[in-house]
Swiss-Prot record:
Role this protein plays: Catalyzes the decarboxylative condensation of pimeloyl-[acyl-carrier protein] and L-alanine to produce 8-amino-7-oxononanoate (AON), [acyl-carrier protein], and carbon dioxide.
GO molecular function: 8-amino-7-oxononanoate synthase activity; pyridoxal phosphate binding
Organism annotation: Bacillus thuringiensis (strain Al Hakam)
GO biological process: biotin biosynthetic process
Keywords: Biotin biosynthesis, Pyridoxal phosphate, Transferase
Name of protein: Putative 8-amino-7-oxononanoate synthase
Pathway assignment: Cofactor biosynthesis; biotin biosynthesis
Root EC class: transferase
Positions annotated to bind substrate: 23, 135, 356
EC number from the UniProt entry: 2.3.1.47
Amino-acid positions noted as binding pyridoxal 5'-phosphate in the UniProt annotation, renumbered to this chain: 110-111, 182, 207-210, 239-242
Quaternary structure annotation from Swiss-Prot or TrEMBL: Homodimer.
The family this protein is said to belong to: Belongs to the class-II pyridoxal-phosphate-dependent aminotransferase family. BioF subfamily.
Length: 395
């Protein structure tokens, strides 16, 4: 190997080790279940995005099998070549009916959706206003676009308005936000963001990755909680890989936006389409989340229980108001030690460190699901509290 490159890479890896930011892969089995196997140890799964427990649902498995038998295992090409199966159009119609939008586009992942949409819509003549805690895919999309990047303090609408007010009137304006923030579990002020976008002539993209299938009418997303709010949002992005238990993502909104993305979005144009099996499972999942209110109600109730008990115990869980509940520790060292102790006690509790979260805010990110029982959560809370006291971390 080229020696200068080897030296450079070894130095960078050593720095990651020293900073407590080196990452390893761990073999995990049964991750679709409430209890998983990680490194051959049985643990309560409090780290998964399988929020409604659909990743192991027999109805989704059967739908995937049926489509595989009918269409094969691969799409064989990009959608613009010969990979656009009728399944795509069926799923996109379902999304439009679900979200109340004109047109939808199914893409390969949430990351490629955000990177592709933002980088194709915005250019160096534009300004993108982004919440400081938005997902990395949003940040990367803005960087790739070459647009002026204005980050406003997390959920600070006054700061955003100052930035909008002082922006060049000659430049087009785009606001982009997560609806549920993936590492903090709090939510965006969508009504107020829409008011600002209308006041200053911007458009807005919302990332519903951690809200699709859960919140709003029929689980359509956080933007559907308030009447008439969703239709004022220009582009909705959501994923199939979390609450819907599948893989892939969608972009939906007015037809002109989606038509433009279909023609200009490089992460859509230059990639092989999703396999038919995934589309079959997605179609079934969209049906289920609209009808199965009990799963969504269980998830929301479990989130409320878990948050309230951790707060009562004295933990810093920030402003979490959803099924995503962080315990903010601070240092990488303490967070890694806490994570190790929790896993030894039988809880899949993963340390989240910079650059995923800001420096000095390393945390354990817990995610409850609709399938957890109160007994599961109580068992976990007792052990979390006991270990934290032993380590003199929080309580």
């Amino acid at each position: 190997m080229n020696q200068p490159w080897r030296t450079h890479l070894q130095t960078k890896l050593q720095q990651l080790h020293e900073q407590g930011q080196y990452r390893n892969l761990h073999v995990t089995e049964q991750a679709e279940e409430t209890w998983l196997i990680r490194d051959e140890k049985r643990m309560l799964n409090l780290a998964s995005n399988n929020y409604l427990g659909l990743a192991g649902d027999e109805r989704l498995k059967e739908a995937a099998i049926v489509c595989t038998r009918k269409y094969g295992t691969g799409a064989t090409a990009s959608r613009l070549v010969v990979g656009n199966y009728s399944l795509y159009e069926e799923v996109e119609r379902s999304i439009c009916n679900w979200k109340g939008t004109e047109k939808a586009l199914v893409v390969n992942s949430g990351f490629t959706a955000n990177v592709g949409a933002i980088s194709s819509l915005a250019c160096r003549h534009d300004i993108v206003f982004s919440d400081k805690l938005n997902h990395a895919s949003i940040v990367d999309g803005i960087i790739l676009s070459g647009a002026e990047h204005k980050r406003y303090r997390h959920n600070d609408l006054n700061h955003l308005e100052v930035l909008l007010k002082t922006a060049s009137p000659e430049k087009r304006k785009l606001i982009v936000t997560d609806t549920v923030f993936s590492m903090d579990g709090d939510t965006a002020y969508l009504r107020e963001l829409v008011q600002l976008k209308e006041k200053y002539g911007a458009i807005i993209i919302v990332d519903e990755a951690h809200a699709s299938g859960i919140y709003g009418i029929g689980g359509a997303g956080l933007s559907h909680i308030e009447k008439d709010l969703a239709q004022k949002i220009d582009i909705h992005m959501g994923t199939f890989s979390k609450a819907l238990g599948c893989y892939g993502a969608y972009l939906t909104g007015d037809a002109i936006y989606i038509e433009y993305l279909q023609n200009m979005m490089r992460s859509f144009i230059f990639t092989t389409a999703l396999p038919p099996s995934t589309l079959g499972a997605v179609q079934k999942a969209i049906e289920i989340v609209q009808e199965d209110h009990k799963r969504r109600e269980n998830l929301i109730a479990n989130g409320e229980y878990f948050r309230s008990k951790l707060r009562e115990a004295g933990f810093n869980i920030g402003n979490s108001s959803t099924h995503i509940v962080p315990i903010v520790v601070g240092s990488n060292e303490n967070t890694l030690r806490f994570s190790k102790r929790l896993q030894e006690a039988g809880i899949a509790a993963i340390a989240i460190r910079p650059p995923t979260v800001p420096v000095h805010s390393s945390r354990i990110r817990f995610a409850v699901t609709s399938q957890h029982t109160i007994a599961d959560l109580k068992w976990a809370i007792d052990r979390i509290t006991h270990i934290a006291k032993e380590e003199e971390l929080f309580v």
